[in-house]
A protein has these predicted regions:
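PLD/PLD-like phosphodiesterase catalytic module centered on the HKD motif
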Residues: 1-162
Length: 162
């Protein structure tokens, strides 16, 4: 359930505007409301879960064509292990690999020996050309959403894309 705490329209010096919303999201489904008309999603996240990436592409209410993710932690081996412990692990791995080969899924990692990137930022390009920028506390991971008492606070800016 999304609980909107604040809404406003912001006008910039050039006259363009963006709708601003600050919200508390307690569930993955409420967070997915930001991605309803998404065509392309660019994401910087501290942690991610292969199963959640798979869910984004499989969700019947979304039309995500591509996802590009920069992962800022150093838990790559843990992701492999967590995927092995997932129902349908082979199916998920095969689907993600197919998406990667088709160019629809790109996952970048940082050199974690030098830096950890703790940012959570999503740029959503919608099918109508509008864009949504989300900045907040929500990781693209199972831990961020399932069985957690954590509330993710996000700020979203929506523009017409120009």
């Amino acid at each position: 359930m999304t609980k909107t705490e604040f809404e406003a329209t912001v006008e910039f010096d050039d006259g363009s505007t963006a709708d601003l919303e600050m919200a508390a999201d307690k569930s993955w489904d409420s967070f997915l409301n930001y991605f309803g008309d998404a065509q392309h999603v660019y994401c910087v996240t501290y942690s991610q879960s292969p199963a959640f990436i798979y869910k984004m592409f499989q969700n019947q209410d979304l039309a995500v064509d591509s996802l590009e993710v920069i992962v800022g932690d150093n838990q790559h081996d843990d992701y492999r292990r967590s995927l092995k412990n997932t129902n349908n692990a082979k199916k998920i791995a095969a689907q993600l690999e197919s998406l990667r080969q088709d160019g629809d899924l790109l996952i970048h990692t940082v050199d974690s020996a030098r830096v950890l990137l703790h940012t959570k930022l999503y740029i959503v390009e919608n099918q109508d050309g509008s864009r949504t920028l989300i900045c907040g506390s929500a990781n693209l991971s199972k831990q961020a959403w399932q069985g957690s008492k954590q509330t993710n606070v996000n700020i979203a800016w929506r523009t017409d894309g120009d």
